[in-house]
Amino acid sequence: MQPIISFEQFNFQYKHAAQPTVKDITFHIYPGEKVLIAGRSGSGKSTLAHCMNGLIPFSYEGISTGNILIAGKDPRKKSVFELSKHVGTILQDQDAQFIGLTVEEDVAFYLENECVNQDEMKKIVSESLKKVGMHTFHKQSPHELSGGQKQTVSLAGLLTTNAPMLLFDEPLANLDPASSLHTIELIKNIHKQYNKTIVIIEHRIEEMLNLDLDKIILIDEGEIVAIDTPERILASNILPSIGLREPMYIEGLKRLHFDSNNDVIYPLENLHKESISGVIKEWMEKKAFCKDTPTKKELLKVENLSFSYPNKQKALENVNLSIYEGEIVALLGHNGAGKSTLAHSLIGINKTKNSRILIDGVNINSWSIRKRGEIISYVMQNPNHMITQSTVIEEVSFTLKLKKVSKEEIKFRAEEALKICGLYPFRNWPIQALSYGQKKRLTIASVLTANPKLIILDEPTAGQDYYHYKQFMSFIRKLAKKGISFIFITHDMNLALEYADRAIVLHEGRIIANHTASIVLGHPATLQRANLKESSLFKLVKFSGIANPGKFMELYFDDIRREEGV
């Protein structure tokens, strides 16, 4: 069988780059395969994707050497339009992909370019939307849809092209756990029904394993470091060495010093149940549960908070909660559960009645957004939505200039914030020279100049690979030790388990759980109601058959925190 995608000793160097971004790339993908190309940020995986769909060299100029064939043809000698008939692409930023004002108009875009007659076009659009379960949304605006629904509409648009290859660029970015699983099941169904070749660019290995991949291609610093089956990749210990995360249950097995005797450790069900049970019980006997719970001062208190948008049902109903100094709290729930509404109510965007929001015992209901912003800072998910200045130092100084603070004070506070955030060496850099992770830290530095007591972070680790995720969260923990409190709005269960002191779960505007993350995320009924999913570590513990899985989870993460000095 001839490969449908073929790279042989391929190199590519961007026009203004000093050296090649990808070097000596050789691999083959065959028709009908499901392949994951994984690597941390800047590894070169997106460059390979752009070579496949023609964005290189037609949108991104540079020099290439070696051989590349897509469906037997050299893509460098074809137009992007010609390549789109062979390779359909779904971008990470779904909003950037939409053309039409309605769902059906967007799905019809390719057919309009092909001058398909209207009757045939309507039939194909309807069939494509039915294939992905979105036919009832055909008159809606794409921008009214959730992240998962946008992904699904984009896929429907690709199905109208009959392209034999589908290329997904980080398809799970910004999706809640339920939407992620839906997207994966959708891709599996499309593959099963139409035998499409599936290529996925992603750094989250654990979630993508649900796709039943044929092989994984690992790339690091522009070079391929491994091509193998998921089973062999996970048994090789290579993922941590290139800054990628192993499934949490495999991390757990290593922490428990489990000896697999070279048995296959993936999938989880292949493990020997009695051996797992034995090693977990032995580990628990050695560990004493010693949770240090010093008395902390209450910083924020919310009493009877309710909020309704115009002409809609209540978005929040009778919410009561407290946040303590230096505490990190994960705010969890499905899309539409009320997480963002709660955050907007705390910072004053949403005006509430008959409720009390207290900071250090003072009711701030009458405070303006600006005054609240001096105590409670809100950091958006996408740093590009917050950054307005051209250099790092200008961005961090901007708020202080608006407050007419003296030049000496501005310089001192801005430089101090940059030092705390590890950005002082880059203070004179242009913003566009920063990485995504550095921009995230810059947004934190900007709010730190106001000396806030509470920082709300919307999806703090979205778009960051595991290496930068660890760096960023280590930085957040240091700030928490200084007494700053944090609320994370997140879909990342691993983040909540590892870093949050507490997890609060919202469902239909109400709090349905408020406890340590290990207890909350080990409660099946809560997970089901809130469209959250079990961690693979909890699945492993349940699989072992031990009497109290929740106790193990609490002990396990307590042990990690003590080791890290938390």
Curated annotation (Swiss-Prot):
Enzyme Commission code: 7.-.-.-
Keywords: ATP-binding, Cell membrane, Membrane, Nucleotide-binding, Repeat, Translocase, Transport
Binding site residues for ATP 1: 39-46
Bilayer topology annotation: Peripheral membrane protein
Annotated InterPro entries: AAA+_ATPase, ABC_Co_transporter, ABC_transporter-like_ATP-bd, ABC_transporter-like_CS, ABC_transpr_CbiO/EcfA_su, ECF_ABC_transporter_ATP-bd, P-loop_NTPase
Annotated compartments: Cell membrane
GO molecular function, one term: ATP binding
UniProt keyword ATP-binding, yes or no: yes
Enzyme's top EC category: translocase
CDD domains (UniProt xref): ABC_cobalt_CbiO_domain1
GO cellular component: ATP-binding cassette (ABC) transporter complex
Chain positions recorded as ATP 2 binding sites: 333-340
Pfam families membership: ABC_tran, DUF3744
Domain ABC transporter: 5-246, 300-533
Family named by the database record: Belongs to the ABC transporter superfamily.
Function, as annotated: Probably part of an ABC transporter complex. Responsible for energy coupling to the transport system.
Matching PANTHER family: ABC TRANSPORTER ATP-BINDING PROTEIN BC_2655-RELATED, HEAVY METAL TRANSPORTER
Protein known as: Putative ABC transporter ATP-binding protein BA_2641/GBAA_2641/BAS2461
